[in-house]
Every structure is written in C-alpha cells, then in structure tokens.
C-alpha cells in the first residue's frame, strides 16, 4: 500500500493527525448520537482487537481512546474530533463477539451497531479490525455481511502484525484477500498495522484523508 501513496499525502496526513484530537461525545444508543456534521470514519472489531490502541497510534495521543485489557469494556459509540480543517470525525465502535457478556448486553450492543451502520448518512467508511494472529472469525463474517447488506463501504485492517512471523503474516493477508471476494462492500486493499511499533499507521492515515477528500 505504501508504494501507491504519494509521500506528500503521507506527510499531510501525519500533520493532520498530529493536530488537536479530542473526545467529544459518547452514545449508548442511536437516540443519543451527536448531530451529523462533516464526515465520519468508524472503527469496528472484536473485543480486544486493538481499536482504542489503533486510534491512539493514529493520533499519537496515548490517552485519547481508553484502552483496557477487559474485553467488552467499550459499550458506547465514542466520537473524536480533530482540527477544524480535518473535515471528519473518528468513531470507536463497541467491540463485538465477547461471549462472556450478559445476553441482554450483547443484544443491546448488536442493536446499537446495526442501527448506527444503517442510518448514518455521514459515515463514509468502516475500518474493520482483524487480529493478524487469528484472521477472520465467524463473528467477523457476520459483521461484514451486515455491512454488505447496509451498503456501507468498509476496509480490513490487520492489527498486532508485530506478533506474527513474516511468512505467516503474508499467508494471513492472502487468505483475508481471498475471503473478501465474497463481500461486495469490501474495499479490496488490506492495511497491515501494529499499534506497538506504529507500522502501517502512515499508510492508514493517508488512506483516510484521501478518502475524506474524495467524499467531501
């Protein structure tokens, strides 16, 4: 992905994400969502896949999104806003697939995620985070299918790539690419990242601002 992105774009993205990003809103239900303003880019994934860590790595602000070793801690849609010229917000979605949570809570999270995906006109893309150590699970496929049915554009981001051997990682990327052929709303390119060593972050930042520029 690096080869396809202009170095000037990567630098512009770095500067934008190094700006003043702040938490602005937490929504436990669609009734409490903030007014639609500008564009929104959301991050979805299984519990403990590294969504909050990725948002912190993107913005270079370790405390922006709260991280936790307890699966299922993020139970709301969390909105972050950047510099005035950014033109978009970041949305940290509740983690899914946490089997130990009460069934009523799982149902509530599922409803919130589905309603948000299907009714948010300002949402331009969902980045679905997949743990590079494990690949796409059944629960991930369920979410991808929901995105397909909702006609919401999404892209796969592999996380924790630093914890996978290079040969195994290449196989994981190939298998994920093949799996995406079944999903019409999926963007074909996969972003490989590590929040620990920041690999893939420049490319992901650049991809986001390129997308926002195209949709603005």
From Swiss-Prot:
Residues 37-214 form the EngB-type G domain. GTP binds at residues 45-52, 72-76, 92-95, 159-162, 193-195. GO terms for molecular function: GTP binding; metal ion binding. The keyword Cell division applies. PROSITE patterns: G_ENGB. HAMAP family: GTPase_EngB (MF_00321). This is Probable GTP-binding protein EngB. The lineage of its organism: Bacteria, Pseudomonadati, Pseudomonadota, Alphaproteobacteria, Hyphomicrobiales.
């Amino acid at each position: 992905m690096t080869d396809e992105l202009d170095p000037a774009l990567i630098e512009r993205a770095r500067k934008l994400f190094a700006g003043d990003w702040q938490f602005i809103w937490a929504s436990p239900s669609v009734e409490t969502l903030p007014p639609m303003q500008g564009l929104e880019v959301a991050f979805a994934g299984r519990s403990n896949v590294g969504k909050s860590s990725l948002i912190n790595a993107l913005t270079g602000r370790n405390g922006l999104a709260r991280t936790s070793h307890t699966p299922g801690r993020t139970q709301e849609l969390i909105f972050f806003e950047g510099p005035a010229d950014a033109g978009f917000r970041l949305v940290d979605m509740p983690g899914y697939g946490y089997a130990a949570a009460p069934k009523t809570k799982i149902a509530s999270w599922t409803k919130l995620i589905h309603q948000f995906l299907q009714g948010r006109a300002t949402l331009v893309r969902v980045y679905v985070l997949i743990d590079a150590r494990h690949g796409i699970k059944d629960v991930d496929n369920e979410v991808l299918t929901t995105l397909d049915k909702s006609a919401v554009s999404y892209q796969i981001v592999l996380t924790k790539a630093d914890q996978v051997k290079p040969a195994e990682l290449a196989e994981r990327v190939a298998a994920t690419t093949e799996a995406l052929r079944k999903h019409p709303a999926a963007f074909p390119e996969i972003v490989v990242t590590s929040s620990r060593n920041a690999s893939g972050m420049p490319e992901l930042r650049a991809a986001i601002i390129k997308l926002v520029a195209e949709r603005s």
